[in-house]
């Protein structure tokens, strides 16, 4: 006999591709940026929302400042707002630009390709 989960379905996740533009030198490291994002999210939406959203950085290029953050689907607009509110990370002034929201990491990573790159439809 197969056991059923009583709690319901596993929450779906969305992946938001973003780019960090640093005004003071190189972009911050992954840990510095994740700490700044969590702090802004906590201040804007509270501890309960932060716990339910479970934001985490699944991909981050420290040289370019590009990355992907995973979040529970119901909180995707919260993470977009929090990304826009991040102004300091690792002691540097930064501006975070959300590029694309996707249902898969692979789809989010496509946002980093150049517009004429293969697989993007030449758009």
Swiss-Prot record:
Recorded GO CC terms: cytoplasm; ribonuclease P complex
InterPro entries: Pop5/Rpp14/Rnp2-like, Rnp2-like_sf, Rnp2_archaea
BP term (GO), one: tRNA 5'-leader removal
Molecular function GO terms recorded: ribonuclease P activity
UniProt keyword list: Hydrolase, tRNA processing
Gene3D superfamilies membership: Ribonuclease P, Pop5 subunit
Highest taxon in the source lineage: Archaea
Cross-referenced HAMAP family: RNase_P_2 (MF_00755)
Family, as annotated: Belongs to the eukaryotic/archaeal RNase P protein component 2 family.
Function comment: Part of ribonuclease P, a protein complex that generates mature tRNA molecules by cleaving their 5'-ends.
Designated name of the protein: Ribonuclease P protein component 2
Gene: rnp2
